[in-house]
Amino acid sequence: MDPVIEDVLAANRAFYDAHESRDLDAMRSVWEHSQRTVCVHPGWPILRTWPIIEESWRRILEGPGRNQFILTNEAVAIDGDIAWVTLDENLVDAGGTGTVAATNLYARSDDTWLLVAHHGSPVISR
């Protein structure tokens, strides 16, 4: 596998590891702290800028329940210093299971890929 793709997938895995472990510091480390960051949690309105996104993650990670992610259907595309990962987040929690279709956009800063946009949409059964 291309080492750049491996780096992007490692950054993406770090995002989900931070979520699963409910580690706000780890979540902070995977995001770019800028005005251009955007996040859409399933069922939430669009959140813009790092301070607002950080507060949303604090609320989620300190809230009740735990999520385990089984990531499937991953695809990576890279164009210069921008990369995006599309995937299915298969969630397992105390309430059952569900799938969220997600897109994560990363920007390379030096040799680090930082998350600049996350969008998750629930998959409705047909």
Residue locations for each model-derived region?
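A beta-strand edge to alpha-helix "cap/lid" segment located at domain peripheries
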Residues: 1-32, 36-126
